[in-house]
């Protein structure tokens, strides 16, 4: 979310792997391998259709130890989280939603981790991107608000880190409510706050969603500016 250069992230992961291999801590080594596969997926040039189907295969996960299966819960949270994020990046929103729901089964094991932000943020957006004002039911609203309310609370405590994410999810909510002018304002707010905070991936996503919405509203010039 910070927008660090992927080459630098990969170098940090490789250093972490070199250290962890000396300690024989299998779960942490697996998590680092998951992160490495995710970064490599983002770095790989695309030819043809971009899909996350093979980004994080099931064989990345070792069999859980019989004597302490609960020890793998945090690792499983990260696995399904990163797999869901990879699907989201490719626009495979239904697959992203399914994987993020599985991550939610293990979210209890990662209290205080910043990755909970990614879980709630992408869970809300993976669902909202599949919906239209006509299909936005009360059940879907509750599901999105389950994630949005968490981020809104964090944004009140630490707006510098969370307010841009709150604005982007809120833009999606009011888009689904048919309040187009407010949605445009919130997309713009998300663009501005993510730029000011240096959150480059969120800024790019905010521009993309704002551009798609502007085009759907009949504003091609504004849409082109975002893209």
Spans of model-derived segments:
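Helix-coil-helix junctions within alpha-helical repeat/solenoid scaffolds
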Residues: 2-227
């Amino acid at each position: 979310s910070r927008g660090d250069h992927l080459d630098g992230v990969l170098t940090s992961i490789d250093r972490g792997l070199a250290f962890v291999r000396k300690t024989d801590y299998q779960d942490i080594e697996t998590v680092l391998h998951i992160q490495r596969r995710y970064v490599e997926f983002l770095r790989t040039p695309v030819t043809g259709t971009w899909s996350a189907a093979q980004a994080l295969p099931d064989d990345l996960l070792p069999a859980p130890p019989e004597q302490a299966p609960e020890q793998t819960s945090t690792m499983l949270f990260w696995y399904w989280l990163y797999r869901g994020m990879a699907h989201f990046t490719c626009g495979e929103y239904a697959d992203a939603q399914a994987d993020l729901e599985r991550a939610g089964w293990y979210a209890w094991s990662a209290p205080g981790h910043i990755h909970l932000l990614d879980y709630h943020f992408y869970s809300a957006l993976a669902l909202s991107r599949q919906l239209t004002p006509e299909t936005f039911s009360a059940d879907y609203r509750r599901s999105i608000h389950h994630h949005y309310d968490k981020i809104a609370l964090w944004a009140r405590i630490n707006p510098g880190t969370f307010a841009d994410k709150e604005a982007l999810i809120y833009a999606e909510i009011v888009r689904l409510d048919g309040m187009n002018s407010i949605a445009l304002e919130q997309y713009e707010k998300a663009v501005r706050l993510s730029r000011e905070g240096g959150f480059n991936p969120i800024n790019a996503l905010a521009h993309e969603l704002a551009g798609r919405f502007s085009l759907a509203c009949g504003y091609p010039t504004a849409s082109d500016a975002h893209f």
